[in-house]
């Protein structure tokens, strides 16, 4: 049976399933799970994440955070779910997850399920001012970069390249619903004005939701209330 040395996956589904099942049957200690999270292959890291129920130290939190970006999507999604479960159920753990740059990068993951879990997890860390300020700063940088890239695109550019920036912009706007207080008002106004003029209606719809949520940009609100798209206008109904 051929095995990919980088991922730990076998080429046939049944073998991968059997390996995962055999791991689930084992009783791992916390230290063993921690080691698998650090050094395991893809199936091992997935199973270790699902079984990792205690986060008591910075080392525990770091082992999860280090697998939130820059690794296989199966691991990233499992870790994003686990972090959400931990932060939503334990206030004591919040101080261990102050990694604003990593959270910001994970906010724009290519997997929308991960984006949603990370945005919802970040809300629990908002009370930590250091995290909130630095996370928001990173999100604003990504937002501005996406807007700049979209300004450069022309009709001949490939659709997937444009969609990549729109996807980033969408999730940045979603995250700003929770952190808009940490953005300079003029800067936020400029961003919202640009987004309100975007040709993609989902961006205008997300902008309308943010404008309505913040409630202090009447000119942009009036513009979006008259938008050509039904779903954008419906935000204010």
Question: Positions of the model-derived regions?
Answer:
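Structural detector for internal amphipathic alpha-helices that build alpha-solenoid repeat scaffolds
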Residues: 7-25, 43-57, 66-69, 74-93, ...
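Leucine-rich solenoid repeat scaffolds
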Residues: 221-237
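Short, positively charged, low-complexity/disordered linker segments
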Residues: 189-205
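Generic alpha-helix initiation/capping and coil-helix boundary signal
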Residues: 13, 41, 99, 114-115, ...
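Short, mixed-charge aromatic SLiMs
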Residues: 76, 106-109, 145-149, 198-199, ...
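Amphipathic alpha-helical scaffolding segments comprising HEAT/armadillo-like alpha-solenoid repeats
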Residues: 1-5, 24-36, 57-67, 89-106, ...
């Amino acid at each position: 049976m051929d095995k990919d040395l980088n991922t730990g996956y076998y080429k046939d589904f049944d073998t991968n399933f059997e390996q995962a099942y055999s791991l689930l049957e084992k009783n791992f200690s916390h230290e063993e799970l921690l080691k698998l999270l650090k050094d395991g292959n893809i199936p091992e890291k997935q199973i270790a994440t699902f079984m990792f129920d205690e986060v008591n130290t910075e080392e525990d939190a770091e082992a999860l955070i280090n697998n939130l970006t820059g690794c296989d999507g199966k691991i990233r999604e499992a870790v994003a779910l686990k972090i959400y479960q931990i932060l939503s159920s334990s206030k004591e753990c919040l101080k261990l997850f102050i990694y604003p740059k990593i959270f910001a990068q994970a906010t724009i993951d290519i997997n929308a399920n991960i984006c949603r879990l990370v945005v919802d997890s970040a809300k629990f860390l908002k009370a930590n001012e250091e995290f909130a300020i630095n996370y928001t700063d990173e999100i604003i940088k990504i937002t501005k970069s996406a807007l700049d890239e979209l300004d450069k695109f022309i009709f001949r550019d490939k659709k997937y390249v444009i969609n990549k920036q729109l996807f980033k912009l969408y999730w940045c706007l979603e995250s700003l619903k929770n952190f808009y207080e940490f953005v300079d008002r003029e800067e936020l106004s400029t961003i919202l004005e640009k987004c309100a003029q975007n040709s993609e209606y989902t961006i205008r719809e997300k902008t309308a939701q943010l404008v309505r949520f913040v409630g202090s940009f009447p000119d942009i609100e009036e513009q979006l209330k008259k938008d050509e798209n039904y779903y954008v206008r419906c935000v204010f109904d």
